[in-house]
Amino acid sequence: MSRNNPYHDWYIWRDPAPGGSMPNNWRSWFGGPAWEFDEKLGQYYLHIFDKSQPDLNWRNPDVRATMLDIFRYWLNKGVDGFRLDVFNAWYKEADLRDNPKQTGFHLRNFEKIDHIYEISQPEMIPALQDIRKILDAYPDRYVVGETFLADAAQARTYVGDDRLHAAFNYGYANSPFSAKAFGKAIQYWDSLHGEKAWPNYFLNNHDTSRSSIRYAGPDDDAKLKLLATMHLTVRGTPYLYYGEEIGMRNISLPYSQIQDPPGKRYWPLFKSRDGFRSPMQWNAHPFAGFSSVEPWLPVHPNYKVRNVTNQAGTPASLLNFYK
């Protein structure tokens, strides 16, 4: 690794500021500064998330061209589409200016600045248009994007005939358990799309505590059936997170078993996202039939009762309700 490496500019490197400090005041979502110093190069590299995930420099034409080629590669392999992770954080403001500071009390340092220069840059729109052109050359392909720190109106700007087919919006998933609250979230998201566009909805994902915990109890599947009725009949495309169809619950983990970087950093104030990422519960076999060896995260203790095989054979089960 050196400054002369042809791939050096594929990432965002900067020399230290006068006095040796970091290039700007940006913070990592996972905690701490967004800059990591490399002793060998004498430079900082940018990582909006974990330090093992350096941000690509999308302003480098070679990076952009290569990423577009990656889309073509997988489309040629026959994939049906893509989910773009925090895509609106791909581009950063060219001058990497300091973000303005937020007022008031904020627990996390990340929340103490207003994130305007490292997300939702205008260059993202042409990039999405190029991605969409590639997908449109293949029949029946689909691309959805996960926005980062963007409200529903901002997320909607990335959707269109020449952009994403859909973008995720957390307003629906974050609603309290009431018809009025869900109705308000649905009506607002639907109104942003209009009659000629198509909304989408999710209740669960890898960053959100399972709806079975948020809205129901350890064994209350009646509310989950009600949620499924709403979720699968509202105008729009529903997304399901694995295990949602059998009512999987979060697992409780001691600190020693946590894998999630922010969970390790903020324990016990934030006990990680690992609780809603446990292995799929297929059957009552060891490790719930997910694997023949110990998985990355432990299986929920209820797997011998709550699994696909058991519910498939129970007419009134949540799984058969989904079917």
Task: Tell what function each PLM region has.
Residues 1-323:
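Active-site and adjacent substrate-binding regions of carbohydrate-active enzymes
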